[in-house]
């Protein structure tokens, strides 16, 4: 698609420095996002949380995240990544401090909501900037490597957190995270380029007026929407919450064993995103579009999740491996995010990305809380715990297959980017 805003590609050195600054902020965002999975046994015991409480607590972060996405896109397009991220990260600092000081479930939930709001720009802001600062053939790679950095954050949220817990406790941990977010603010303020606003793009001509309506009506965006909600959002919900309770309460892991399993799962995800960053430019040159890769790759995730469900408690020590393979197979859907951005001109990239992100994180919230509600509901009907987990996951699996089927039936009518 033709841009209506002139690009200003950075030199290699400046591009690396900008990437590092935003990547550190996103590292912290992913760490804080995923930390509830490692803390779930401790928080469940300390605050007497039910499955739906735990799902709501983890989902509260994503509710805050999703709530900002539509205004975030407009602000990014208008004010640029630097200014927006700095204001948002101030809210993230407040969220970390509030979590450290919380003495009730409602206090924890409010703190997670604030953290979600404050960290909600950490991926969309750099991706919006990369749309203008980086050459087109570098954008898929930059996106995959940002997700790889996020996986580093998720790795840091597992065993390192588990090791620190007996030494300092979870409250001190969140004070430290607040300090690191402040450091990230300094790095972004130092390295992020000034955002050039083009006045003519807002004042004249019918082409200057498109906004969220143009994004949500776009056939390519609409074909991707159900998968963003159920598949991408659901995979994040598994990785950041329900994998750990499954390993403990279905497969019989101890909390430490589950933390080790989650650590290696996140290492596997890190490796997957690194591999995508290396492989996608080569695949694209040979005609393998994002659509084609998603079409051919996603069924593997459905097969793996079905095997996990059917195996139940019989999967034993292989639970961590199975969940790692499932999450890795879901990384095909990560190709959709930069593809959606590239389907729009750069002056709409922020709104396109934030709209897509809204669907992802609304999906994370819905799946995290919905699975908790389903588990508690089936338990209330007298089901055994393992069976309740299996049925809740089966319902989720059916939704993901339906989302994929919708994509297959509509994609032939879309004009997806290469």
Mark where each language-model region is.
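Extracytoplasmic
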Residues: 17-51, 238-244, 367-371
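Extracytoplasmic gate region of multi-pass secondary transporters
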Residues: 36-37, 219-277, 364-372
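Helix-breaking motifs and short loop linkers at transmembrane-helix boundaries and internal kinks
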Residues: 48, 80, 101-107, 118, ...
